[in-house]
Amino acid sequence: AEAEGPFGLGREALPEEIAAWDIDIRPDGKGLPEGRGNVWDGEGVFVEQCAVCHGDFGEGVGRWPVLTGGFDTLTDQRPVKTTGSYWPYLSTVWDYVHRAMPFGNAQSLTDDEVYAITAYLLNMNGLVDGDFELSHENFSEVTLPNEDGFYMDDREELELPEFTRDPCMENCKESVEITMRAAVLDVTPDEAVQTM
Amino acid sequence: MTTSFKGTKPSRRQFLSGAAAAGAGTFVAAQARAAGDPAITELQPWTQQLGDGVDVAPYGMPSEYESHVKRRTVEWLTADPISSINFTPLHELDGIITPNGLCFERHHGGAAHIDPAEHRLMINGLVETPLVFTMQDLMRFPRENHVYFLECAANSGMEWRGSQLNGCQFTHGMIHNVMYTGIPLRLLLQEAGVKTEGKWILPEGADAAAMTRSIPMEKALDDCLVAFKMNGEALRTEQGYPVRLVVPGWEGNMWVKWLRRIEVGDKPWHHREETSKYTDLLADGKARRFTWEMDAKSVITNPSPQAPLTHGKGPTVLTGMAWSGRGTIPRVDVTTDGGITWHQARISGPSLDKSMHRFYYEFDWDGGPLYLQSRAHDSTGYVQPTKDQLREFRGVNSIYHNNGIQTWYVNEEGIAENVEIS
């Protein structure tokens, strides 16, 4: 049988080490550092640090992600899923911008800059006024429109019973017709499909 | 590639089609009849001259004739090649193990190059003692070896609206299957001492994406591994060197690479990769979250659009792979007529929990059109659904978790195409 320890390996993490790496934020505000930033300052930082990819108003440049708008499109043929139209929690915006943006220069923004950018994103999504200031104190008062748009995986109850049945083996259908062809779209890289 | 032709003479139509290998095969066959096969009757250079010394390739690469067997990307799928995807060449592989250099890549901040001497793994949060491990520390824990598939949640995601990409590399190649050597995550968590309120973990990467996902404690204590070897050697840079998380059967995004920290908490974190991404939008505008398991799935890898039939009619080997995030694959059915009649395929090789399985179906091709499909059954009794069955539950905008049955149409010339059928 495998030894189950404890093995006495590793050493205790120091408070300053934990502080350096434990930067995650939760929807209930756990992990938020003290700080504040307003829409006006957020626009300044956004234009300087973010707009080259995401556009001046979060509309996205080229193929880079759209951050704003898209309200009431989630049942459309082509939904536009943004922080405003789709994301459930503001904490995710703060956490993700702080840990991974700007793309190529991650974890370079100050806490106040992240508060300011988050406030500006709220404003661009039409969720707060231009004089709004976001801080660790009022953070949990902000709710995003699609907070209730998600529910726990229900495949087990909904799909699995339907797909756990003995399948047909013979005379399963009358005929077969092609209804769609990838070759018509012709978007596969050329050199990959060879006749050798 | 040259093949000498055996069996039934190809039709004039096949000859005129000019498919390279079929044409070459016919040519060789004709020559062989005339004066013997020059591959036999003429002395080949590799028979006469000496080969490479043992010092030529300290770390060997595949034969130069296999240079087409490689990862490929599709540029239009993502905004840039850093936060992007490439694809395993499934149509060129056999058995169940994916060679390390061909395992597909998915990065969000590029493949980080980490000096293992400078790498640390921290465990903090709701634990008795927050800990820091060096790689040297990790190498002193008991190890386990397991073969698991890692499938990107978005594998086949481009196909929700219909047939789009022509080749199983592109439609199904966000997957690999390797043997991991690693430490049961349970042992590392026990070392720190999880408090009773600790119900979730948050693994985090050391790369510029600092990838995080919330994983329930039950799974963390069950079969997750902190792995440092794949197929016997160190993890490849692009697979998380020096250490990654292994989350058997669950969507690839959760297998955090360049693992630097595991936090224990009492609630999920709802981070970007489990809210904005890796949530499955349904037709009613609501979305499923925490869709962790990868359902049973299969694909025929040969023949397929990148691997047409070039040998003419007669004995033909159909092969493919099947897998399930919920167990093993006791059975795979295949059809050559679009699902009118199904046959049980033959599974060859090990049948391991949450691992790929290799299946074969040998048949006599009459030269007529083929509508090929495979249908996996897993050890829970689940049978792989059609794409239409999935769309009834989910619509076409859920992006992730498309495990619908794939159809290849093979025409009289042996050319295969990604299609959907009635």
Language-model regions, residue ranges each:
Chain B
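Structured, non-membrane catalytic/scaffold regions adjacent to prosthetic-group chemistry
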Residues: 35-422
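Enrichment for repetitive, rod-forming helical segments
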Residues: 19-20, 251
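Sec/Tat signal peptide C-region and signal peptidase I cleavage site
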Residues: 31-33
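Intrinsically disordered/low-complexity terminal segments and short unstructured peptides
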Residues: 1-2, 7, 25, 46, ...
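N-terminal secretory signal peptides
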Residues: 1-14, 21, 28-29
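Intrinsically disordered, low-complexity segments enriched in polar/charged small residues
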Residues: 17-18, 77
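A generic secondary-structure boundary signal that marks alpha-helix termini
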Residues: 24-25, 194
